[in-house]
């Protein structure tokens, strides 16, 4: 036995020398017992309630539907007037999920966990009819240990049940219903890093060096003590080891120990907005010299600080936080967002110059934080809204921070939003305790709140690190004077003006939703001019105040819910609508924060019946000046408005505020309407550098299809659709006239078809008063546009999306899907116990993607190695073969009685895997 053990130790030593210590060789993490598998597919769902124990024939015969996660049943409707307006008049009910899980025999001596990234809300989980746990919050992730409740065997089902009660809402917004984020199955050795158990901080950072501290919580769930060795390797983006730490400690049975390790990185590559560089840390656990766990943590190195007079600094550079609020939903899908939607949302905002995302009003989705890390978007991570109680607040603080504290994008933990306890003794008590806990869990980040009431009472403003206000810039000015030591971070919300894409308040017809707007605004229809004016006035004040770190637009993107009055199913206060179509106000930010020459004019130029009447034409630009022309006749040149003068404490007595603060930030012409072409020419140094034209269009004639994100980024920046059954593509349909101009008032019904097995999982048009079904294959255009969301299958290749409409020329677009990238090998053994010398075990190595799904097209060369009392079928301890349909297979046979056999599978560029076989 000692011979086999020594050989395996030598193999691991050579593996690490070859992969870690060569300056020219990428490091690949060594094989371990940890396996993480996504379990999103093939759940059964029903929207009704019954006891879990009622697993009768009657219950099984109910109309359960097959669903895949993420899943939001509320968005399926129907819209009913008697339902809650904050939830978009959509149902909030009780639902049940069930799923059979199969665990191979080789997991029998491991730990088995289930992880839910988010379930809305008040969920209960059963495994094989045993109640595992209850989780109240709809926004924090949670983990359950299933080990004592599951059975093992490829043909033995384990019955998983989840009851979700979404009747009571947490926030005053649309929150959806169901398991709306990913779910995972995690298998580990009994000696393992706890889930979310590694915390990496950078206490001292300069361009020359960075000091890294890694805290790693290791659990020993064996019934005997274990001598644990933890080796932590820091890997740069090229895969090279840049630092390494090692420490050993004896951990008693059924207990845990937190390792604290420190190392120095020379010439660290700092994470920044324009260069979001990421490192990886691998925590490698050895038990008696055998590697049993490898845990990956992604992090970035950067510094930041808030200054009471000068605002925010990132890596020593002063930066204005150009922020936006956003919920977590989308047209047609509700809250059940595929990962690509998070990328679409954050990238669309970043392309306008936004650099700061506030996850109002809940902890951000893990995948959205990953995107922010990757593209360089700072984050305000909101933990709680109400300050419900000490118990609830502190639990949410712990759950959120432990999960999210390694994301370099996160800079602030927000402890409440517009709580009625602001400025009270009880509120100060809760928020002080929350700040203390936040600092204990994460000493590197700061706490804040989003206040709507005075916070200069009862020590409330002193209870957090950064003071932030919703809308009250005058209150912020006074508090800055009265409390000069306060770090007044942001207007955490500003504007809140509503505006519908393509609606200007001068239309000669009425829409169904106009009556609702009249009710809301005392007879005044909110329109795009008013929305833009309000946004301009707020941002102009923010940038005039040096002490302000920045501000967060309310909101960046339209969200379901909070319409306030029937039939509105959304507030409509975003710079993007529910489909991510830009409204005119979006281009205000483009003009403020981007360098490439641009000019944007509005409104559209279809005003039949208003000939000769003056139309207000507004223009946003980052050029020196703009010339406007109507049918090639110049209407004059206007210079870009000047920047505001900086605010000083003396300005506070100016009522109304100084003129420089309230000056508009757009150019404006009154143009007597005549059909034709209106053109804006952006000038720099007197030369035209950009042009936008708007034409009076003809009648709808044809449909044009394209990928939605081409409105924001070049096609080359958009990742191909992945054929994994999870990825999606959003197809935009535009209604064009004969000259191929978008008809800005078109509302034609568009029918979508997919000419393969891909599925249409939702449709939308951005109309906040539409009650059309979200789960459909057709949708009316709203002001010329609509979308369909297409989900991939697990078959790579090309598929065609086609769109038709009565009386219009149809269009089609070809979309290519590619096979998922192979990431890792997972190894199985059947049987995993050998009791006879002539018995064999089949070892199967699966080539898997990042979700833990087998890649059926994979043909990678796989090398098997073993140590222990066994040989491969070729009578050696090494066997190489090619995978077929994603699997490489080999048999082993015992060489002698007694002992453990460890089989490792390796393939170039992939994370290797291992499995144990017991020879009796």
Residue ranges and their predicted role:
Residues 57, 226-231, 273-280, 622, ...:
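Short flexible loop/turn segments that cap and initiate beta-strands
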Residues 23-50, 63-106, 113-121, 159-226, ...:
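Non-catalytic, glycine-rich low-complexity segments
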Residues 25, 29-30, 44-50, 87, ...:
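Accessory beta-strand-rich segments of carbohydrate-active enzymes
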Residues 153, 217-307, 668-675, 684-685, ...:
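Extended acidic/polar, glycine-enriched regions
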Residues 214-218, 603, 617-621, 681-682, ...:
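Beta-strand-rich structural segments
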Residues 107-111, 150-157, 171, 225, ...:
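Short glycine/proline/serine/threonine-rich loop/turn segments at secondary-structure transition edges
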Residues 127, 209-250, 259, 616-637, ...:
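Beta-strand-rich binding/interaction modules
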Residues 31, 35, 66-81, 130, ...:
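Extended substrate-binding grooves/exosites of carbohydrate-active enzymes
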